[in-house]
Amino acid sequence: MAAKKQSKSAKALRTTVRYEDVAVSFTQEEWEYLTSTQKTLYQKVMSETFKNLTFVESKKKPQEPNPNLKDKDDDKSSTCTGVFKGGPFFFCLTCGKCFKKNTFLFNHQFPVRSRRLAVTKPQSRKALGHKPQHRGDRPFFCNLCGKTYRDASGLSRHRRAHVGYRPRSCPECGKCFRDQSEVNRHLKVHQNKKPVAGSHVKVHQNKPVASNQKQKGRVPPTTRESPAPALRHLKVIQGPVARAKARSSRASSLEVRSTSVTVARPREKVYCPYCRITFTMRTCLLNHLKIHFRRQPNQHFCCKESHSSNTLRMQKIYNCPVCDSSFRGKESLLNHLCSRRPIRLSKCWEILGHLLGYLREPLGNIFKVRESRKRRRKRISSDSSETEGPSGSDEVMEVDTDSDLS
């Protein structure tokens, strides 16, 4: 009996101690209740325990070598870099887990693969079974599209896309942007542009020009007094032999078409009887109706049921949250938000700005400002017409008096 007890005690001593047995783990709710000093103390204690475990593992006795597993041991020794020598640990401040490398902590906080699967394959098991870690890191979300952000500045910048608010403008071309970073990115386009050559042609009479190096220039524009050249838009090549090249008749015909005034005909909008999406062309409506005919009548209209990328692209819809009008493109939705309708006095983006709390002025003040501006314009136009009227009548009276005297 004593021998059996000794064998049991020896087995109990030989059992390995894991990190999970020694470590103390807190739940998310318990971790939130801890103070900053308690969190730092917990990190220090856990780092010390981890170092002690690695030290004990390095001091273990080596096992007896097995001749059958020599090759495998050699491969392991070549791949293994050694025992962790102890260094700075990386702790997650939200759940308290520690990691050896910063990359492990980053993958723990921001799992990239699950996000890609959720976008590319939304019905896959990995994407459906995945639960996003640390939701508290992105508490700010948009009520319209559901996008989440870490801080309020990112959410306000995203709201400008819905409202169409672009306060920053380019000093070179006058284009408007949402923030200064987009303006700085746009200014690089102006910096990379090469300076346009002048209209005059520089002729180097003294310097000889090689046959392989040809300098190109343009003929100076003609004035009213100077005679016009025989060919339009000559392209002169300076060198040992001067040649003139005229552009083809096709290019000139294209110029005439571009300069001619085109009258835009109003197109009748056609809407889908199933989902009430409006289209300007009937062919687009017919292509859209194929999606409804493919599916069964009891199924709902959803992007998940389509099988190809073209059908997904056609089913992508942008809805206006104010007037419930749907569009296929993002630009058309922004144009609709910024345009003013004759039925409504205000634009859709103004109403949306008040709903989101972006514009602080009430709609009544905006209407008053518009009415005052209209009245001022009417007064200015009436004053200008009155000033022009009496001057014209005086001239007529003077002409009549001159005719009477004659």
Curated annotation (Swiss-Prot):
Sequence ranges of Acidic residues compositional bias: 395-406
Chief place of localization: nucleus
GO molecular function: chromatin binding; DNA binding; double-stranded methylated DNA binding; zinc ion binding
Positions bearing the site annotation: Crucial for 5-methylcytosine recognition: 178
Domain KRAB, chain residue ranges per copy: 17-88
Keyword line: Developmental protein, DNA-binding, Metal-binding, Nucleus, Repeat, Repressor, Transcription, Transcription regulation, Zinc, Zinc-finger
Cited PROSITE patterns: KRAB (PS50805), ZINC_FINGER_C2H2_1 (PS00028), ZINC_FINGER_C2H2_2 (PS50157)
One GO CC term, this protein: heterochromatin
Function: Transcription regulator required to maintain maternal and paternal gene imprinting, a process by which gene expression is restricted in a parent of origin-specific manner by epigenetic modification of genomic DNA and chromatin, including DNA methylation. Acts by controlling DNA methylation during the earliest multicellular stages of development at multiple imprinting control regions (ICRs). Acts together with ZNF445. Required for the establishment of maternal methylation imprints at SNRPN locus. Acts as a transcriptional repressor in Schwann cells.
Family as reported in the entry's similarity comment: Belongs to the krueppel C2H2-type zinc-finger protein family.
Note on domains (UniProt): The KRAB domain is required for function as transcriptional repressor.
Stated name of the protein: Zinc finger protein 57
